Regions:
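PLP-dependent amino-acid enzyme catalytic core
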Residues: 1-324
Length: 324
C-alpha cells in the first residue's frame, strides 16, 4: 500500500505490458503513465523543481514558466500546485485540448502561441515568448527542460536503474526522443553500468534529431524542429524513425486490446516492432520499451476518426485489426 502526501510522491511504477501476449511482439512495455501527471514527464518535472529549490533558482515569490507541447506542462502544473508555486505554461495549437484544460484545472496559466516557423513547428516561438516573459516579469524562472541537466539526471538516477533491476538479462532498450532527457539519462546509465545493453532511439519522421530531415508533424511529444542539446548519435546503437500514420495505427491497435496509450507510446512500440522484426527474427532478445504516456488526452486526436481522416487520410485500420 502506498500512502502519499503530495501528488508528485506517486512516481515509480513496476507495471510492464507483455506485448507478446497481446500483439505477438516480443517486447515488454514499461508504463510510465501511472502517476497523477499521466506521463514520464513527472520525473523530469519533479527533478528540475527540486534542483531549482536546492540551488536557489526558485525561491519565495518565484513563478515557474516553461515551454511545453503538453505532457511536461501537466507534470509541472502538478509539481507547482503541490508546492503552491505559480506556473505559466507556454504551448501551441498542437497541444491536445484536453491537456490545456487539465493544466488550467490544476491552477496553471496557459499561453498559446499561434505563429509557426517555416517547418510548421512552434518550438522557436514558444521559447522566444518564454524569454520575453522572463525579461519583463520579476521572479519568473525558466526551468528550460531543453538544457537543464536535472531533466536527464531524473532518468539516470531513477528510470534506468529501475529497468536494470527488473531485467537483469536485458539486451535492448527502446526509448522515444523528444528533448532527449529520457534517452540520454537511460543511455548514460547503461553505458556506465551495463554496456552490453543496446539503446535504440525511436523518433518520428519529420524530426531533426540525429541530423535527419525536418518535416511536418502533428502529434505532440516526440520529435524536435531544432537540434536538442541532450541528443547526439554517440548515445545510441541505432535510430528508428516512425511515420506518424504508423504510430496512430499502433495506438489504435493497442486500444483494441484494452490498452489506451498515448501517441508517444504508439511511436515507440511501432518502431520497436519494426526493429525487432529486422534484427531479432529468432526472438531471442530480451527487450524493453518505455511507454511515455497514457491515451486519455488523445481522445480528440489519435482516437478521433474525423481528426485522423482529416490529418492522415485512410489508415486502413481494418488491416491492422486482422493482425492482432
Amino acid at each position: 500500500m502506498a500512502i502519499i502526501s503530495t501528488a508528485d510522491d506517486l512516481l515509480d511504477s513496476d507495471v510492464y505490458i507483455d506485448l507478446d501476449h497481446t500483439l505477438g511482439i516480443p517486447l515488454n512495455l514499461k508504463c510510465e503513465g501511472f502517476n497523477f501527471a499521466g506521463s514520464v514527464k513527472l520525473r523530469a518535472a519533479t527533478s528540475m523543481v527540486a534542483s531549482g529549490l536546492r540551488n536557489g533558482l526558485i525561491d519565495e515569490g518565484s513563478t515557474l514558466v516553461e515551454s511545453s507541447s503538453g505532457n511536461l506542462g501537466v507534470a509541472l502544473s502538478i509539481v507547482a500546485a503541490a508546492r503552491s508555486i505559480p506556473f505559466v505554461c507556454v504551448t501551441d495549437p498542437k497541444c491536445n485540448p484536453a491537456t490545456v484544460k487539465l493544466m488550467r484545472a490544476l491552477g496553471s496559466e496557459v499561453v498559446v502561441v499561434d505563429r509557426p516557423d517555416a517547418s510548421g513547428s512552434y518550438l522557436s516561438a514558444r521559447k522566444a515568448l518564454v524569454r520575453e516573459l522572463c525579461e519583463h516579469n520579476t521572479g519568473y524562472v525558466w526551468l528550460n527542460q531543453y538544457e537543464n541537466p536535472a531533466n536527464w539526471l531524473a532518468h539516470y538516477e531513477n528510470t534506468a536503474p529501475l529497468i536494470a533491476k527488473q531485467f537483469p538479462a536485458l539486451d535492448v532498450l527502446f526509448v522515444g526522443v523528444g528533448t532527449g532527457g529520457t534517452l540520454s539519462g537511460c543511455a548514460e546509465y547503461f553505458r556506465e553500468n551495463r554496456p552490453g545493453v543496446r539503446i535504440v532511439a525511436v523518433d518520428t519522421v519529420g524530426s531533426v534529431n540525429f541530423g535527419l530531415a525536418a518535416g511536418p508533424r502533428h502529434l505532440p511529444g516526440l520529435g524536435a524542429s531544432e537540434p536538442m542539446p541532450f541528443v547526439h548519435r554517440g548515445l545510441v546503437h541505432d535510430v528508428v524513425q516512425v511515420p506518424e500514420r504508423d504510430a496512430v495505427r499502433m495506438c489504435r491497435r493497442l486500444a483494441r486490446h484494452g490498452f489506451l496509450l498515448g501517441g508517444s507510446t504508439g511511436t515507440v512500440v511501432s518502431g520497436a516492432a519494426r526493429w525487432l522484426a529486422e534484427h531479432d527474427p529468432g526472438r531471442s532478445l530480451n527487450a524493453v520499451a518505455i511507454s511515455a504516456d497514457l491515451g486519455d488526452r488523445y481522445i480528440e486526436t489519435v482516437y478521433d476518426d474525423a481528426w485522423v481522416q482529416d490529418t492522415y487520410g485512410d489508415l486502413h485500420t481494418e488491416r491492422e485489426d486482422s493482425n492482432g
